[in-house]
């Protein structure tokens, strides 16, 4: 949730920074006005309660002394109670209105994020490995899949519909091997493996920032409070929702492999062939919870962890720093890793590593204490793909294809495929 103290402290600077993230200035004026109203109502409520409590004490004395002012004082207390009821109702409604607005405002970009409008303004940080120069015309992964019977596209459509995949034969074994390889790499790097439900409740999606803004991107279970999770970021971030952690327990590192479900609203006509954009896909996720002063250092190490998998598989990739206009809703800073796909003759996103600062922690109420007597502070949360399995599968198949259409595998995967 957006930190309202930023608006209270300097609404002009806040507007300027958030304009870079495409948030209208009018929204902040609306929030500022509501916040002033809410705080005034709270002050009125506090003053009236103090007056009521004082009069209640006087009533006892007046009654004991049979003072003629007793009835007048009782009437005044009843009047205050009635006024308090009205103020309390108004305050509750206005507080709900304010919270709903705060829930749809994205996180503020960090000052280190390049300013820009869209993906064209993202900044390339580095490239690792040169794309392979084929001495033949390389096939796309969907053609290689058909040639080698790695995917049954027809049965996928028959059983479910478009944007779903059935991997078969060597294709299925490679898919499983990549999942295990990514998990093993993450666990060896110190991440605690979690096996989580793929159905999550509304509170979890609010905590991660997916709701209420991105409801159209989700699959909701009918007549329930449940949704199919769009990413294990939701489950892993919410492991400590409504908890106060010990500072000595931080940082916490988690990794999980889960199927992910997305409606892909608004993506009609994009990446219609192959496995790049599916309604259901698998992803190995990383999540970190840490102290605020450590979060940007943790972002660098998280990104390096995802990069280490691509390097172990010897896949050409590049790291991109997202500009303000391309940042995700919950993110203060994001690096994208893009792997080279010959079929596109371009780099395609395979990982997104983000520092969400205290944005998700405020929504999910994830706090920590330095000592028992110390005040609570919000943790910082980070998340990253390590990696998106279907896109990784496509990258391996395309980059390791041979002239006869066969596919070799990276040395790092040899012990995983049998």
Curated annotation (Swiss-Prot):
One of its GO terms (biological process) is selenocysteine biosynthetic process. Keywords: Aminoacyl-tRNA synthetase, ATP-binding, Cytoplasm, Ligase, Nucleotide-binding, Protein biosynthesis. Pathway: Aminoacyl-tRNA biosynthesis; selenocysteinyl-tRNA(Sec) biosynthesis; L-seryl-tRNA(Sec) from L-serine and tRNA(Sec): step 1/1. The keyword Protein biosynthesis applies. GO terms for molecular function: ATP binding; serine-tRNA ligase activity. It comes from the Bacteria. One of its GO terms (cellular component) is cytoplasm. Its main location: cytoplasm. L-serine binds at residues 231-233, 285, 385. It catalyses: tRNA(Ser) + L-serine + ATP = L-seryl-tRNA(Ser) + AMP + diphosphate + H(+); tRNA(Sec) + L-serine + ATP = L-seryl-tRNA(Sec) + AMP + diphosphate + H(+). InterPro entries: aa-tRNA-synt_IIb (IPR002314), aa-tRNA-synth_II (IPR006195), aa-tRNA-synth_II/BPL/LPL (IPR045864), Ser-tRNA-ligase_type_1 (IPR002317), Ser-tRNA-synth_1_N (IPR015866), SerRS_1_N_sf (IPR042103), SerRS_core (IPR033729), tRNA-bd_arm (IPR010978). ATP binds at residues 262-264, 349-352. SUPFAM superfamilies: Class II aaRS and biotin synthetases (SSF55681), tRNA-binding arm (SSF46589). It is found in: Cytoplasm. Its EC number is 6.1.1.11. PANTHER family: SERINE--TRNA LIGASE (PTHR43697:SF1), SERYL-TRNA SYNTHETASE (PTHR43697). Belongs to the class-II aminoacyl-tRNA synthetase family. Type-1 seryl-tRNA synthetase subfamily. HAMAP family: Ser_tRNA_synth_type1. Consists of two distinct domains, a catalytic core and a N-terminal extension that is involved in tRNA binding. This is Serine--tRNA ligase. It comes from Ureaplasma urealyticum serovar 10 (strain ATCC 33699 / Western).
């Amino acid at each position: 949730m957006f930190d309202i103290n930023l608006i209270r402290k300097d609404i002009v600077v806040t507007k300027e920074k958030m304009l870079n993230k495409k948030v209208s200035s009018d929204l902040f004026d609306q929030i500022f006005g509501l916040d002033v109203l809410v705080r005034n109502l709270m002050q009125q409520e506090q003053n009236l309660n103090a007056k009521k409590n004082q009069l209640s004490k006087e009533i006892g004395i007046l009654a004991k002394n049979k003072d003629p002012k007793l009835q007048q004082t009782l009437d005044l207390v009843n009047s205050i109670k009635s006024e308090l009821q009205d103020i309390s109702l108004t305050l509750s409604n206005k507080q709900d209105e304010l919270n709903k607005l705060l829930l749809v405002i994205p996180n503020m970009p960090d000052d280190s994020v390049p300013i820009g409008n869209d993906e064209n303004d993202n900044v390339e940080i580095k490239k690792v490995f040169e794309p392979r120069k084929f001495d033949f015309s390389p096939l796309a992964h969907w053609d290689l899949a058909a040639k080698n019977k790695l995917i049954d596209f027809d049965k996928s459509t028959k059983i479910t519909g478009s944007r779903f995949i059935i991997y078969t034969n060597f294709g299925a074994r490679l898919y499983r091997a990549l999942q295990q390889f990514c998990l093993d790499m993450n666990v060896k790097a110190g991440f605690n493996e979690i096996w989580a439900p793929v159905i999550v409740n509304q509170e979890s999606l609010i905590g991660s920032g997916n709701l209420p803004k991105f409801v159209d991107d989700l699959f909701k279970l009918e007549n329930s409070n449940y949704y199919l999770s769009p990413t294990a970021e939701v489950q892993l971030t919410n492991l400590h929702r409504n908890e106060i952690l010990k500072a000595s327990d931080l940082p916490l590192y988690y990794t999980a492999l889960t199927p992910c479900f997305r409606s892909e609203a608004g993506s009609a006509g994009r990446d219609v062939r192959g496995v790049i954009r599916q309604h259901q896909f698998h992803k190995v996720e990383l999540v970190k919870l840490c102290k605020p002063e450590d979060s940007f250092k943790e972002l660098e190490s998280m990104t390096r962890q995802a990069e280490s998998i691509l390097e172990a598989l010897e896949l050409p990739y590049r790291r991109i720093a997202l500009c303000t206009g391309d940042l995700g809703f919950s993110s203060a800073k994001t690096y994208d890793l893009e792997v080279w796909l010959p079929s596109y003759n371009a780099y395609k996103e395979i990982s997104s590593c983000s520092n969400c600062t205290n944005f998700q922690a405020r929504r999910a109420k994830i706090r920590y204490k330095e000592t028992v007597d110390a005040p609570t502070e919000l943790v910082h949360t980070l998340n990253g793909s390590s990696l998106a399995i279907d896109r990784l599968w496509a990258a391996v198949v395309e980059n390791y294809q041979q002239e006869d259409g066969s596919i070799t595998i990276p040395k790092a995967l040899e012990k995983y495929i049998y």
